[in-house]
Amino acid sequence: MRTTNLIKTAVIAIFTLPVAVHAQTVQQAPKQCLAPNTPVGTPRGIHPGRVAWSHAPGAATWDGSKASAWFDDSCNDYTLCRWLVAATLRNLTGEKSEKRAWRAVFTYFNTQRGKQGKSYGKGEKIAIKINNNNTYSHEDSREINASPQMLLALLESLVEEAGVPQQCITVAEPSRFITDYLYNKCHSRYPGIRFVDNSGGDGRMKAEYSEGAIRFSKDNGRLARGLATAFTEAYYVINMALLKGHVGQGVTLCGKNWYGCTSINADWRKNAHNNFDQNRNGTPKYMTFVDFMGHKDLGGKTLLWLIDGLYGCKNVGGEPGPLWTMEPFNGQWPCSLIGSLDPVAIDMVGIDLLTSQFPDMPDADYSDMYLIEAAQAGNAPSGTAYDPEGDGTPLKSLGVAEHWNNATDRQYSRNLGKEEGIELVYEKKK
């Protein structure tokens, strides 16, 4: 398509800009399981393996002071957040309008499930899994969590452009709490949308679970096996993760975001985390996240994968920080939204961004291990037969894994003209 070709040209032109030299470039990059531009797995999507990265400098402007909070409206440009959602959808699908892009996304999802040409249907429920991990009650938390402006931008897009009725949408964080700044902003605009969290009350609904809904592919000890009914009863799911690091696994992106759908305690210290961490020497092993990614009620229902990168963070907790010095951010917040129809490809791009900006992130070595397993789930390097429902039907490849060539050009195989691997489509707001 002509539009797609124009986008590709723009991407290549932007990616060849020189990179500013800064101190952290001397830091040795984390070790990874996969070498650059050596894709494995089967790409997914309308345009296979495509990841759309939208960048709107100035969308997030918090200065780090205590006089304001990162989530305040004064520190976030809602108009730019809406642009990020619209641009991501357009570039992901190749469509010229947001409305047509949604239609293409719904049609692709249903066609993959044997319902050729079907778009969104009347009464079909959508559950959105956000990452509000750093919350302790309904009171506002200054730590990094889901952005109220970005979430509202997505909800507006779903209601006004995709035509999804408010009562068919659920925003869920079953393992934690939906704080006031998030709930109040979104509920005041769309009072018909349901909000589900760990405790309920104050307008939120308390999470309920379908016990034993996930049967892990290997013995996972006392790891929670219940799944929130917000997801088991949904027809579609949207995974809206954050762009940040995490101790143990190196990163927390879309793959780990599923953990919050399980019947765990709001106090993380009381929960099991079996087979979350990669082997420190890079030896392949069974990874729990692959079971989440391939489960019929989680990854199997996912319409769209998103990574909210308004405030990308080096660490899992605390206030957002530090600012990003790499190109194209140049000392600002990343002010980005990343989207894909391929659950493996999107997290690979997230890893490449995080480890390029923060090469000294804790536990970043081999942080791509769960994605290498997911990309080759039908013939996993660890030898695991992934079957998250335990019904004797093993998973096949869940998507394509690949690292970009370098942090300067940021090109994947399809950006280099090959018919394999990932294609990264970047657009910067003018």
Segments from the language model and where they lie:
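Sec/Tat signal peptide C-region and signal peptidase I cleavage site
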Residues: 19-23
